[in-house]
Amino acid sequence: MTKIFAHRGFKGNYPENTMIAFEHALHSGADGIELDVQLTKDGRLAVIHDEKLNRTTNMKGLVKDYTYEELKRGDASHSFYEETGAVTIPLLEEVLELVTQRSSFMINIELKNSIYRYPGIEEKVKEQIEHFQIEDRVLVSSFHHGSLALFHKLMPHIELAVLTMDVIHQPDMYLKTIPAKGYHPNIKGAGVTKEVVSALHADQQVIRPFTVNSEKQIKNMLTLGVDGIFTDFPDRAVKIREEMK
């Protein structure tokens, strides 16, 4: 059965990558969440997508140039302020504390280190995975495929996934070079086909496209038999999956 991941929490209805979004994702019927981590100036794992604070907070500048205590003073509610009030950028440990309350709930941690390298981010994520004992239900993804190769050396038993905005020719072969098990392509690309899904499955690999939001996209991906989807509207995807059973 195709797993449904709540993209950045419940991004369609709540401020992305915030505790309120993750709380609602937890009760949406989704099988897991996806979140993004970056390192603050003082080496904390902040959960935020953009390298710049401007789009999703009332602050300006780069995440890496602020300590976490400074970031906490900002408001990350952006366009949802009237519904949620002010909310803060959470730490990875806060999110893991929440979601580990539900057994089997999956967590996709995306390392946002393709623009700024954030040396040591792999080791810090490893520490959190071990602390919360979620090795059996976590996957780590990144657009920085060299970072995934490093993570494999640190935790060879953890599932890794290659993120890409472009089409990768023979992704089943490419994944083996890292090595990674998961292929996470952009739904807007031309790389999600029956042939690609079959080739990956033949090598015991998995495919989880992003970001799958419309009813048509969701139905198409479920019909293709992809292993998972990332969606801003997990409740919608869960409903469609139930209807298609």
Swiss-Prot record:
Disulfide bonds: none annotated. A divalent metal cation binds at E34, D36, E110. Inhibited by EDTA and various organic solvents such as chloroform, toluene or benzene. GO terms for molecular function: metal ion binding; phosphoric diester hydrolase activity. Optimum temperature is 55 degrees Celsius with bis(pNPP) as substrate. Signal peptide: none annotated. Its EC number is 3.1.4.46. This is Glycerophosphodiester phosphodiesterase. Its ability to hydrolyze DPHP into PHP suggests that it could be applied to eliminate DPHP in the environment. Could be applied for the degradation of other toxic organophosphates to bioremediate the environment. Its cofactor is Ni(2+); Co(2+); Mn(2+). It is an enzyme of class 3 (hydrolase). Optimum pH is 8.5 with bis(pNPP) as substrate. The active site is at H7 (proton acceptor), H49 (proton donor). Coiled coil: none annotated. Keywords: Cobalt, Glycerol metabolism, Hydrolase, Manganese, Metal-binding, Nickel. InterPro entries: GP_PDE_dom (IPR030395), PLC-like_Pdiesterase_TIM-brl (IPR017946). It comes from the Bacteria. GO terms for biological process: glycerol metabolic process; lipid metabolic process. It holds the Pfam family GDPD. It catalyses: a sn-glycero-3-phosphodiester + H2O = an alcohol + sn-glycerol 3-phosphate + H(+). Gene3D superfamilies: Phosphatidylinositol (PI) phosphodiesterase. Residues 2-241 form the GP-PDE domain. Belongs to the glycerophosphoryl diester phosphodiesterase family. Glycerophosphodiester phosphodiesterase hydrolyzes glycerophosphodiesters into glycerol-3-phosphate (G3P) and the corresponding alcohol. Can hydrolyze the model substrate bis-(p-nitrophenyl phosphate) (bis(pNPP)) to p-nitrophenol. Can also catalyze the degradation of diphenyl phosphate (DPHP) to phenyl phosphate (PHP). DPHP is an aryl phosphate ester used as a chemical additive and an industrial catalyst that can easily spread to the environment and exhibits toxicity toward organisms.
